[in-house]
Amino acid sequence: MSPSLQEGAQLGESKPSTCSFSIERILGLDQNKDCVPLMKPHRPWADTCSSSGKDGNLCLHVPNPPSGISFPSVVDHPMPEERALKYENYFSASERLSLKRELSWYRGRRPRTAFTQNQIEVLENVFRVNCYPGIDIREDLAQKLNLEEDRIQIWFQNRRAKLKRSHRESQFLMAKKNFNTNLLE
């Protein structure tokens, strides 16, 4: 084997150096799995275990079961959905709802905002004037309507999507009407 090939083979056998810009480093694959994540998702509507000292992870609060029924310990292990559903007959409806909300599939979902009729009227009036309000208008609306600014931003996004959908449907109906009248002639 030539000297240059031997050097290449030796380089391939050597342990790769750790670069700050390697794929493993960027993706965090070179770290322990027990490391605390640098960023936690912002979910103010979810309860955290601040008192348990478990890095602020979401807790699963399970009520005491009726006598004679034993459950696996849930203090150290999160309860999977299948296991929780197996025991759902032993809990009241409100306890089951609370349990469902605390399961992992529900953690990331924010509760739906129920707008009052007054709030909807004000938002619709503003939408008629400006369907793309700036941050200053949204913040004023949030203060006046006692809502969060991000809820107002989402409302306007949804309202624009509704307008676009209705416009598309009306265009389709007009085209369909024209097509039908042309066929009858």
Curated annotation (Swiss-Prot):
GO terms for molecular function: chromatin binding; DNA binding; DNA-binding transcription repressor activity, RNA polymerase II-specific; protein homodimerization activity; RNA polymerase II cis-regulatory region sequence-specific DNA binding. Keywords: Developmental protein, DNA-binding, Homeobox, Nucleus, Transcription, Transcription regulation. Belongs to the ANF homeobox family. Can form heterodimers with PROP1 in binding to DNA. Interacts with TLE1. Signal peptide: none annotated. CDD domains: homeodomain (cd00086). It is found in: Nucleus. Residues 108-167 bind DNA. Required for the normal development of the forebrain, eyes and other anterior structures such as the olfactory placodes and pituitary gland. Possible transcriptional repressor. Binds to the palindromic PIII sequence, 5'-AGCTTGAGTCTAATTGAATTAACTGTAC-3'. HESX1 and PROP1 bind as heterodimers on this palindromic site, and, in vitro, HESX1 can antagonize PROP1 activation. This is Homeobox expressed in ES cells 1. GO terms for cellular component: nucleus. It comes from the Eukaryota. The lineage of its organism: Eukaryota, Metazoa, Chordata, Craniata, Vertebrata. InterPro entries: HD (IPR001356), Hesx1 (IPR043402), Homeobox_CS (IPR017970), Homeodomain-like_sf (IPR009057). One of its GO terms (biological process) is ERK1 and ERK2 cascade. The keyword Chloroplast does not apply. It comes from Pan troglodytes (Chimpanzee).
